[in-house]
Amino acid sequence: MLKNAVLLACRAPSVHNSQPWRWVAESGSEHTTVHLFVNRHRTVPATDHSGRQAIISCGAVLDHLRIAMTAAHWQANITRFPQPNQPDQLATVEFSPIDHVTAGQRNRAQAILQRRTDRLPFDSPMYWHLFEPALRDAVDKDVAMLDVVSDDQRTRLVVASQLSEVLRRDDPYYHAELEWWTSPFVLAHGVPPDTLASDAERLRVDLGRDFPVRSYQNRRAELADDRSKVLVLSTPSDTRADALRCGEVLSTILLECTMAGMATCTLTHLIESSDSRDIVRGLTRQRGEPQALIRVGIAPPLAAVPAPTPRRPLDSVLQIRQTPEKGRNASDRNARETGWFSPP
């Protein structure tokens, strides 16, 4: 059951589909405890200088695990950053049984399999005036702030998006990293070529990272431009704890949109430089630190559903151990064995 839940959780989005997480499960006769670590070997340093996006990705996978376990009648009790001297250990999760699972909780777990990162143009989301209040209610306001960018402010976001790309234009490490993570020969991670927009398609999407062009298609030609709503997710400050909780809220938003039949695309390139991030911050009335943006809209009804992006095999992301001998802390042992006592 835990293995299936971890497999489902690992459908979480991550920057360039890098999947920068690692799980260690301690299995005993009475209970199982799961530890979440950030895997620094799977970060994208030329894109994500601070490591913020890797932590956000881990927050999303943590919330996905909570949702998957809830659907299996187990409540996840999460302790975040349980070991201050182990900065790469992000959370410890223990489980307690629950008697009743609602249809909504099961649907949320099912939405994990349905969610895609869709980089093509969207039509306007239907009944947004009804959906937006429900979406806001799903967000813990003490953890993150949700702003919806008005149509007349969108041009400022376009400026921020273009500025981000201009600042990276002559960065060979950034472009080499993009080429590697979008290689058509990578099988278990990265961004598959058919999920990227072609030249013709990205001309109709005003907000998006400039990935390498891998195809010459012209999908959704009936949409002359992108009519999505754009959400900004911000946190009270800019700590690692903020980034982790932001990822959990990002998971909530993406799955709520998916359950409502909407398509989504997470945008982080506008946050990767301080100049473009300042523009985004200005659109949120300077309240908090912008962490991610999300395009939300409707894919045309007859449009092909994007194929699921690949994921690493379970034995690459999950290690199961029997409960260690009495008096020895398993997470300390794990850190010593893997050298994860280094500072962040």
Curated annotation (Swiss-Prot):
Record's note on what induces expression: A member of the dormancy regulon. Induced in response to reduced oxygen tension (hypoxia), low levels of nitric oxide (NO) and carbon monoxide (CO). It is hoped that this regulon will give insight into the latent, or dormant phase of infection.
NCBIfam families: Rv3131_FMN_oxido
Protein's UniProt name: Uncharacterized protein Rv3127
Transmembrane segments: none
Region (Disordered): 304-344
Superkingdom, taxonomy of origin: Bacteria
Biased composition (Basic and acidic residues): 323-336
One MF annotation (Gene Ontology) recorded for this entry: oxidoreductase activity
Disulfide bonds: none
GO cellular component: peptidoglycan-based cell wall; plasma membrane
InterPro entries the UniProt entry points to: Nitroreductase-like, Nitroreductase/BluB
Taxonomic lineage from the root: Bacteria, Bacillati, Actinomycetota, Actinomycetes, Mycobacteriales
SUPFAM superfamilies, sorted: FMN-dependent nitroreductase-like
